[in-house]
């Protein structure tokens, strides 16, 4: 049958319309909630989802896909799961979890997803970075060689830390772990004020995991009163936040710190503390029905911490020479450093500062056990003058502890042993320091030099702290400045501090 001219015209018109028909519909992959409870949602239908991808529930609550199974997807919920019901729609976002980063973050308090919680409005100009990225490779790294000063005599002299190092702070509750971390942040104030370029400034990121909100508020107040908030970022996943946010917060903080590392700047990140992160991860893993291992932790709990801490590094000159220094904190139970999480984190880090309850109650604060504390790479970054001054003090302290234990049983001691006990008691007194009072490195050198070279030997123990406070204030600024020179202390240079310390000591004997 032949088509009439009118019908042929219509057919060709329809054909051209159909061939030129384009749809611009946005296709969202959606699933439905099969079950929900304890912060975990099982979702059916998200077949193309990626591991670690963000999803959005119908109620507006977000979650992250952690378990990809044949039948369904295990999603951990960021927030309350009370608004999520069985049968609710779940939409893929198509993006892996990312957080804001950049200098706009300085002075702000944010949650585990980088959302401001300090009531100061939205963040200004910033970029976004993925929370989970691969750590720099071997070729991109360089040996640690620049000092990262904490302002604590016990740390900077005996367990020095370098920029790009990972130094673990480990101890029981209430032994001053957070105090060491906060003092380190406060100490950067005067160092940053002296910095002449971006490459000398050290920015700080403090990640609070599972702490009380009141504790975090107190910390914000301390930092703002000391004007230390201007170079710091606070990431807070408090005890009242869901476990997924406590698990994610360290990675979010690390991504913020990596912005500085990758742009040729220097940053310090404090994870306070990783024991609580491991507990949050254990809770999530057990609820996701992953098989438990030792102490009911999942099998990949080592990888949880290793992939986080490996991101702290000193970059090579070709990649910008930036650095990210990490101070992870681990809480022990009754001083047991052989528990699962402590034994996992100790081999990952480049050394540890061990704090003890007994020393704390004896008035030795910071309560650092010098025998157990070690810095594996920090000595390469230590100032030459400091290395010369405190080189023998660690050995003398070890000998003192050994002899002091024996001296309790007998009173007949020869002159050499008596001198060793006398010097050791003074060397134990010198590292004591009040909280929130970091000391510049040149003043530390002067005080330790006085103790190591016997200027305090004839002084009563209770007057040593007065002597320590007096000498840095009465010394010539030129003498203090000479300690910072790269050449170290030569015999000629020693004459001036020797004369000054000898005269100063007379008033305290």
From Swiss-Prot:
Any Pfam family hit: ATP-synt_ab_C
Subcellular location: Mitochondrion; Mitochondrion inner membrane
Protein name as it appears in the record: ATP synthase subunit alpha, mitochondrial
UniProt subunit comment: F-type ATPases have 2 components, CF(1) - the catalytic core - and CF(0) - the membrane proton channel. CF(1) has five subunits: alpha(3), beta(3), gamma(1), delta(1), epsilon(1). CF(0) has three main subunits: a, b and c.
Encoding gene per record: ATPA
Primary location group: mitochondrion
Keyword Ligase among record annotations: no
Membrane recorded as keyword: yes
Family statement drawn from the similarity comment of this UniProt entry: Belongs to the ATPase alpha/beta chains family.
Function: Mitochondrial membrane ATP synthase (F(1)F(0) ATP synthase or Complex V) produces ATP from ADP in the presence of a proton gradient across the membrane which is generated by electron transport complexes of the respiratory chain. F-type ATPases consist of two structural domains, F(1) - containing the extramembraneous catalytic core, and F(0) - containing the membrane proton channel, linked together by a central stalk and a peripheral stalk. During catalysis, ATP synthesis in the catalytic domain of F(1) is coupled via a rotary mechanism of the central stalk subunits to proton translocation.
MF terms (GO), sorted A to Z: ADP binding; ATP binding; proton-transporting ATP synthase activity, rotational mechanism
HAMAP family named among the record's database cross-references: ATP_synth_alpha_bact
Site entry (Required for activity), positions: 373
Taxonomy, superkingdom: Eukaryota
SUPFAM superfamilies, per database record: C-terminal domain of alpha and beta subunits of F1 ATP synthase, N-terminal domain of alpha and beta subunits of F1 ATP synthase, P-loop containing nucleoside triphosphate hydrolases
Binding residues annotated for ATP, in chain numbering: 171-178
Keyword set, alphabetical order: ATP synthesis, ATP-binding, CF(1), Hydrogen ion transport, Ion transport, Membrane, Mitochondrion, Mitochondrion inner membrane, Nucleotide-binding, Transport
PANTHER family: ATP SYNTHASE SUBUNIT ALPHA, MITOCHONDRIAL
GO cellular component assignments: mitochondrial inner membrane; proton-transporting ATP synthase complex
InterPro entries from the UniProt entry: ATP_synth_asu-like_sf, ATP_synth_asu_C, ATP_synth_asu_C_sf, ATP_synth_F1_a_nt-bd_dom, ATP_synth_F1_asu, ATPase_a/bsu_AS, ATPase_F1/V1/A1_a/bsu_N, ATPase_F1/V1/A1_a/bsu_N_sf
């Amino acid at each position: 049958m032949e088509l009439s001219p009118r019908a042929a015209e219509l057919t060709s018109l329809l054909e051209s319309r159909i061939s030129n028909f384009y749809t611009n519909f946005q296709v969202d992959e959606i699933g439905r909630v099969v079950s929900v409870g304890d912060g975990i949602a099982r979702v059916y239908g998200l077949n193309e989802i990626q591991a670690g991808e963000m999803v959005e529930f119908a109620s507006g609550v977000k979650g992250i896909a952690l378990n990809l199974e044949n039948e369904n997807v295990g999603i951990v919920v960021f927030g309350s799961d009370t608004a999520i019901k069985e049968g609710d729609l779940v939409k893929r976002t198509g993006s892996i979890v990312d957080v804001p980063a950049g200098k706009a973050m300085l002075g702000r308090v944010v949650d585990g997803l980088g959302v401001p919680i300090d009531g100061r409005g939205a963040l200004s100009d910033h970029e976004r970075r993925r929370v989970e990225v691969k750590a720099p490779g071997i070729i991109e790294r360089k040996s640690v060689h620049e000092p990262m000063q904490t302002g604590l005599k016990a740390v900077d002299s005996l367990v020095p830390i370098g920029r790009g190092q990972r130094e673990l702070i480990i101890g029981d509750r209430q032994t001053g772990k957070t105090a060491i971390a906060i003092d380190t942040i406060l100490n950067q104030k005067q160092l940053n004020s002296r910095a002449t370029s971006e490459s000398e400034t050290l920015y700080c990121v403090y990640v609070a995991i599972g702490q009380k909100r009141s504790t975090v508020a107190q910390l914000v107040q301390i930092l703002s009163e000391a004007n230390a908030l201007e170079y710091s970022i606070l990431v807070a996943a408090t005890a009242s936040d869901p476990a997924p946010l406590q698990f994610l917060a360290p990675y979010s903080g690390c991504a913020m710190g990596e912005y500085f590392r990758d742009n040729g700047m220097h940053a310090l990140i404090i994870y306070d503390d990783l024991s609580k992160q491991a507990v949050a991860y254990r809770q999530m893993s057990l609820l996701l029905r992953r098989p438990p291992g030792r102490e009911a932790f999942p099998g990949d709990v080592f990888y949880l911490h290793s992939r986080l801490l490996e991101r702290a590094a000193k970059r090579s000159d070709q990649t910008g020479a930036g650095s990210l220094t990490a101070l992870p904190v681990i809480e022990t139970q009754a001083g047991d450093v052989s528990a699962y999480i402590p034994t996992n984190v100790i081999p990952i880090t480049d050394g540890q500062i061990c704090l003890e309850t007994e020393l704390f109650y004896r008035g030795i604060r910071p309560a650092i056990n010098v025998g157990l504390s070690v810095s594996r790479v920090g000595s390469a970054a230590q100032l030459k003058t400091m290395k010369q001054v405190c080189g023998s003090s660690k050995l003398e302290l070890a000998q003192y502890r050994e002899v002091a234990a024996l001296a309790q049983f007998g009173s007949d001691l020869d002159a050499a042993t008596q001198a060793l006990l006398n010097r050791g008691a003074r060397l134990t007194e010198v590292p004591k320091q009040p909280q929130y009072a970091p000391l510049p490195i040149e003043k530390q050198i002067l005080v330790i030099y006085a103790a190591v070279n016997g200027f305090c030997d004839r002084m009563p123990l209770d007057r040593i702290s007065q002597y320590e406070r007096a000498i840095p204030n009465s010394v010539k600024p030129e003498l203090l400045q000479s300690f910072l020179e790269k050449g170290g202390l030569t015999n000629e240079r020693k004459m001036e501090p020797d004369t000054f310390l000898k005269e100063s000591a007379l008033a305290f004997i």
